[in-house]
Regions:
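N-terminal subdomain of nucleotide-sugar transferases
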Residues: 1-52
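Carbohydrate-associated surface elements
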Residues: 30, 168, 188-191
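A short, charged, and often flexible helix/loop element on the N-terminal side
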Residues: 54-81, 137-140
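An aromatic- and histidine-rich active-site surface loop
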Residues: 72-88, 95-117, 123-126, 130-131
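Membrane-proximal helix-turn-helix segments that form the acceptor-binding/catalytic region
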Residues: 84, 105, 112-116, 142-164
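Well-ordered beta-strand positions
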Residues: 95, 160-161, 184
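Acidic anion/phosphate-binding donor-loop and adjacent secondary structure
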Residues: 174, 183, 191-200
């Protein structure tokens, strides 16, 4: 799977559910959820794999320490640049599906993919990061907050469809655009595979 994190599992199940109707290509990082990159994934920039009829392009990224903000930023930026490069080599795509992780950059990757591939862009929002950051005052700079909001609104505007995982996020989208020219939006809740997830 692309990543053992819950979002990675959901995206894997989504890809598996669509593979009979679409040719699916997934761009993701090499396994590195805990910050460590295995030696076999440090030898080249891209690793192309085929997982159950799904083409997977894994990007090499530097390891990181979750407590070290600088190493985390380096890791995220390496993914962003690598994903842009991978987008140029994946061939023709009819649809680009991107999620709101990493914050802000996930949406911008979708915008880039739409432009580069002349494809339709579906933006799946798991969290509205600028609003979250403002709520907890993680970043005090109004300029930085405003810039982040501008870029994420751009991603929403450029999408052909925004999918949120809850009604509250759809309401936030409407508030973000002050109910004027709100991007087309659909609510699809995240799901679980009851055959694989069960109470302990």
């Amino acid at each position: 799977s692309p990543d053992p994190a819950s979002t990675g599992q959901i995206l894997q199940e989504l890809a598996e559910g669509m593979r009979d109707s679409f040719n699916i290509t997934v761009i993701c990082v090499v396994p590195s959820y805990n910050g460590t990159v295995a030696p076999e994934y440090q030898t080249q920039r891209f690793f192309c794999e085929n997982l159950d009829a799904i083409k997977v392009i894994r990007l090499r990224v530097p390891g990181f320490n979750k407590k070290n903000k600088v190493s985390r930023v380096k890791n995220i930026l390496a993914y962003f640049v690598g994903a842009m490069k991978a987008t140029t080599i994946v061939g023709k795509q009819d649809y680009v599906f991107s999620i709101s992780q990493p914050p802000i950059l996930g949406g911008l990757l979708g915008v880039y993919g739409k432009w580069k591939k002349h494809a339709k862009f579906i933006y799946n929002i798991q969290d509205f990061n600028p609003e979250q950051i403002m709520a907890v005052k993680y970043e005090e700079s109004r300029f930085i907050n405003g810039l982040m909001m501008w870029f994420d609104k751009l991603s929403c505007r450029k999408s052909n469809l925004v999918i949120t995982v809850g009604r509250d996020l759809a309401d936030t989208l409407e508030s973000r655009f002050k109910n004027v020219n709100v991007p087309k939006c659909m609510v699809i809740n995240n799901w679980i595979n009851e055959k694989q997830i069960y109470p302990l």
